[in-house]
Curated annotation (Swiss-Prot):
Location in the cell: Cytoplasm
GO biological process assignments: cell division; regulation of cell shape
Database matches in InterPro entries: Cell_cycle_GpsB, DivIVA_domain, DivIVA_fam
Native organism: Streptococcus agalactiae serotype V (strain ATCC BAA-611 / 2603 V/R)
Segments forming a coiled coil: 32-73
Keywords: Cell cycle, Cell division, Cell shape, Coiled coil, Cytoplasm
Keyword check for Coiled coil: yes
Database matches in Pfam families: DivIVA
Subunit structure: Forms polymers through the coiled coil domains. Interacts with PBP1, MreC and EzrA.
Lineage: Bacteria, Bacillati, Bacillota, Bacilli, Lactobacillales
Record protein name field: Cell cycle protein GpsB
């Protein structure tokens, strides 16, 4: 980004050499007044944008931290899931075994 050469104060305090066929001093003053106003507006806009940029960067950092926490807790839950599934599978196998004993036990008796 290009650096700013003049501040509003520098522009205001700038003196021009006067020559016989020089520019109209009032016209130059009016123009420079407008330039100073523009400069002040630009500086104000830059400050607002920098503040917004900082605020958005902080919000982004917060969201990234939250996302990381969610990922970490999701990984922990994923790692715990196989244990719960194996316990469930074991219960299912026990039920199947009990049902087979009942079904095949009835067939043998009949």
């Amino acid at each position: 980004m290009a650096s700013i050469i003049y501040s509003p104060k520098d522009i205001f305090e700038q003196d021009f050499k006067v020559s016989m066929r020089g520019y109209d001093k009032k016209e130059v003053d009016v123009f420079l007044d407008d330039v100073i106003k523009d400069y002040e507006n630009y500086l104000e806009q830059i400050e607002k944008l920098q503040m917004e940029n900082r605020r958005l960067q902080q919000a982004l950092d917060k969201k990234e931290s939250e996302a990381s926490n969610v990922r970490n807790s999701g990984t922990a839950m994923y790692n715990q899931k196989p244990i719960a599934q194996s316990a469930t599978n074991f219960d299912i196998l026990k039920r199947i075994s009990r049902l087979e004993k009942e079904v095949f036990g009835r067939q043998i008796r009949e």
